[in-house]
From Swiss-Prot:
Main localization (coarse): cytoplasm
GO MF terms, alphabetically ordered: DNA-binding transcription factor activity; fatty acid binding; protein homodimerization activity; sequence-specific DNA binding
UniProt note: phenotype after gene disruption: No longer expresses CS1 or CS2.
One Pfam entry name: HTH_18
Cell compartments where the protein resides: Cytoplasm
Taxonomic path: Bacteria, Pseudomonadati, Pseudomonadota, Gammaproteobacteria, Enterobacterales
Protein name per the record: DNA-binding dual transcriptional regulator Rns
GO-annotated cellular components: cytoplasm
Activity regulation as described: Rns-dependent expression of pilins and outer membrane proteins CexE-alpha and CexE-epsilon are inhibited in vivo by decanoic acid (decanoate); has no effect on expression of DnaK or flagellins. Decanoate relieves Rns-dependent repression of nlpA.
Written domain comment of the UniProt record: Has been crystallized in an open and closed form; both bind decanoate which changes position between the 2 forms.
InterPro entries assigned to the protein according to its UniProt record, in alphabetical order: Homeodomain-like_sf (IPR009057), HTH_AraC (IPR018060), HTH_AraC-typ_CS (IPR018062), Tscrpt_reg_AraC-type_HTH (IPR020449)
Role description: A transcription factor required for the expression of the CS1 and CS2 adhesins of enterotoxigenic E.coli. Required for expression of pilins and some outer membrane lipoproteins. Represses expression of nlpA.
Domain HTH araC/xylS-type: 164-261
Amino acid sequence: MDFKYTEEKETIKINNIMIHKYTVLYTSNCIMDIYSEEEKITCFSNRLVFLERGVNISVRMQKQILSEKPYVAFRLNGDMLRHLKDALMIIYGMSKIDTNACRSMSRKIMTTEVNKTLLDELKNINSHDNSAFISSLIYLISKLENNEKIIESIYISSVSFFSDKVRNLIEKDLSRKWTLGIIADAFNASEITIRKRLESENTNFNQILMQLRMSKAALLLLENSYQISQISNMIGISSASYFIRIFNKHYGVTPKQFFTYFKGG
């Protein structure tokens, strides 16, 4: 079903969003179209959206209340994701899932209705209490129909690749002037070897660096604690004006448009 958007000022379209961490979104205040690999998934308000790590999406969303944030996001770091995966494998009696199988976008991005009581429990848990958060998420997943796809996606998201090691290295200091040579030295390998290993995973050094910089910039903008020039320096771009152009080219919106839409009240 297609959703008909109303006033343009209520909507935003953002391109090239790389999901670096397994993410669960709750569309508390928006209707969202998610585009990936020439497919579109429409998610209405008050739904959960499960986003597999590694997918690249574009989104178009419309707020219902302009002064509030459009959604609530739960992002799982590597340790949380592995613990969640291990627990689910035991609970549901699974040992291994084929990570090489051809999978459609509907198996990587899933939407579902959710019991508000369960969701409130998840939202109210202390963000630093990983065990309680994972336990609540497991319980929530157990109450969802057809949760096999979600469990499969969590398992696949937990698999680590060489490109993840490169990302982890760069993320330690995004302000550094990274080059392929620096990466090669860190892994005690040649630049050609690094390039080929990344190509085998359908990516490259420049793509990884740009995605990490833009993702970090977006998160820093949402924190509302830094000026544009500070954010630019924090992600390794010395010119604020150049950063604004790159951000706009990457996401299709300026940093100001991005911040204004997502900041909420």
